[in-house]
C-alpha cells in the first residue's frame, strides 16, 4: 500500500528542497523524521510537514502501522516562478525570480 502527500507551491527553490529530499529517500519514517528535525535547512521544515501528512494519511485512511512505514518515493518538482522588480541606481531595474516547488512524499509499508 502506497500513500502520498503533496505540498504544492512551496516557497523554496527546487534545488534547495532536493538537497533535503535526497537525504531521506528510502529510509524508515522514524529515521527520516529524526534527520529532518535536526537539519538546519529551511526546506527541511517544509519536507517534514509533508512527511508528517503522509504518515497521518496512511494511519487514518489505510490503518497502517507507523513502525512499518518507509519513505518509498520523495521528489521535488518545479512550480511556477514569481517575477519581481528590484529598483537599482540611475533608473534601472533588475528582475528578481522567486521560485516555488511542488514537494511530493510517498510512504509505503513494504
UniProtKB/Swiss-Prot annotation:
**One MF term from GO for this chain?**
structural constituent of ribosome
Q: Which GO terms describe its cellular component?
A: cytosolic large ribosomal subunit
Q: Which residues form a coiled coil?
A: none
Entry keyword annotation includes Nucleus: no
Record's superkingdom? Bacteria
List the PANTHER family hit by this protein, alphabetically: CHLOROPLAST 50S RIBOSOMAL PROTEIN L22-RELATED, LARGE RIBOSOMAL SUBUNIT PROTEIN UL22M
Instruction: Report the protein's function.
Output: This protein binds specifically to 23S rRNA; its binding is stimulated by other ribosomal proteins, e.g. L4, L17, and L20. It is important during the early stages of 50S assembly. It makes multiple contacts with different domains of the 23S rRNA in the assembled 50S subunit and ribosome. The globular domain of the protein is located near the polypeptide exit tunnel on the outside of the subunit, while an extended beta-hairpin is found that lines the wall of the exit tunnel in the center of the 70S ribosome.
Alphabetized NCBIfam families for the sequence: rplV_bact
What family does this chain come from, according to its entry? Belongs to the universal ribosomal protein uL22 family.
Protein name per the record: Large ribosomal subunit protein uL22
What taxonomic lineage is listed for the species of origin? Bacteria, Pseudomonadati, Pseudomonadota, Gammaproteobacteria, Alteromonadales
Amino acid at each position: 500500500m502506497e500513500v502520498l502527500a503533496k505540498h504544492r507551491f512551496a516557497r523554496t527553490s527546487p534545488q534547495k528542497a532536493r538537497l533535503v529530499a535526497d537525504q531521506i529517500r528510502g529510509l524508515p519514517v522514524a529515521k527520516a523524521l529524526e534527520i529532518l528535525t535536526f537539519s538546519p535547512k529551511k526546506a527541511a521544515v517544509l519536507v517534514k510537514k509533508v512527511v508528517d501528512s503522509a504518515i497521518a494519511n496512511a494511519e487514518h485512511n489505510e490503518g497502517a502501522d507507523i513502525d512499518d512505514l518507509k519513505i518509498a518515493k520523495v521528489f521535488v518538482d518545479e512550480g511556477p516562478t514569481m517575477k519581481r522588480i528590484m529598483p537599482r541606481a540611475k533608473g534601472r531595474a533588475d528582475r528578481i525570480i522567486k521560485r516555488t516547488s511542488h514537494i511530493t512524499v510517498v510512504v509505503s509499508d513494504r
